[in-house]
């Protein structure tokens, strides 16, 4: 990652931390979970919460491996589409990122997988969404405690500390590094450049070397579109019976869903 861009991320975090933290607490209150507890299954938590906001979450393997998720709203319904062709850690972060857009955002976005895209960081809302995701998935009290534990187990080695934290919280390498810098657990000026340029191959190898679960770098390629389509159709039939919508509206919703699905799949 470009060092100057990293400085901007940390500067944004320092300036907006309290505001974003209040959003994390509001989201946790909405879902009925403790805001300082570790999230073991982010998708399980958000699926029902999103439905209360009239958003459906479904997983599809995209042809574009640079997009983590899409947030789209139309026809009275919203869709969060998660790219399952990516490693599990990226999917987890993308889901948490989309929580911000659904609950607090003003725009629709295609969430990028990496932190190093210039266009991505032209939007302040994307800084906010990433800060939100980091705070939600790596709660401060827990993160500080586990950082000390894993640093001790790693004999002070920064890379191994980050890899262990990454495995524990099931989040991307760069997200962990940024969280460490946000909380001033590491001094960015004193860190070697190689720490900022660790690629997926190196991460997987280090996970193996440390006897950690390498599968967090695998893609599930899950495709549950047909399941979501059935849910939407069932709800649509109920709304037609209650005279909230008509047959034409339901057909339009299903048609738009199918078009979005085909576009994402590249078919």
Residue ranges and their predicted role:
Residues 1-267:
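Active-site hotspot residues in diverse enzymes, especially metal/ion-binding acidic/histidine motifs
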């Amino acid at each position: 990652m470009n060092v100057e861009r990293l400085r901007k991320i940390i500067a944004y975090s320092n300036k907006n931390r309290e505001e974003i933290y209040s959003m994390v607490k509001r989201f946790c209150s909405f879902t009925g979970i403790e805001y300082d507890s570790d999230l073991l299954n982010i998708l399980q938590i958000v699926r029902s919460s999103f439905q209360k906001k009239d958003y459906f979450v479904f997983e599809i393997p995209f042809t574009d491996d640079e997009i983590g998720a899409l947030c789209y709203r139309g026809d009275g319904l919203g869709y969060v589409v998660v790219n399952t062709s990516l490693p599990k850690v990226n999917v987890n972060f993308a889901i948490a990122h989309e929580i911000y857009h659904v609950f607090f955002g003003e725009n629709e976005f295609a969430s990028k997988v990496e932190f190093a895209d210039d266009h991505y960081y032209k939007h302040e809302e994307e800084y906010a969404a990433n800060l939100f995701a980091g705070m939600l998935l790596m709660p401060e009290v827990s993160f500080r405690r586990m950082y000390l534990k894993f640093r001790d187990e790693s004999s002070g080695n920064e890379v191994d500390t980050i890899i262990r934290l990454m495995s524990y919280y099931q989040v991307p390498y760069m997200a962990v590094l940024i969280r460490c810098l946000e909380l001033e657990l590491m001094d960015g000026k004193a860190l070697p450049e190689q720490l900022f340029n660790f690629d997926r191959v190196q991460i997987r190898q280090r996970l193996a070397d440390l006897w950690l679960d390498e599968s967090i770098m695998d893609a599930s390629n899950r495709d549950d579109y047909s399941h979501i389509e059935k849910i939407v159709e069932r709800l649509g039939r109920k709304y037609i019976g209650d005279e909230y919508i008509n047959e034409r509206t339901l057909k339009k919703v299903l048609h738009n869903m199918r078009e979005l699905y085909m576009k994402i799949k590249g078919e």
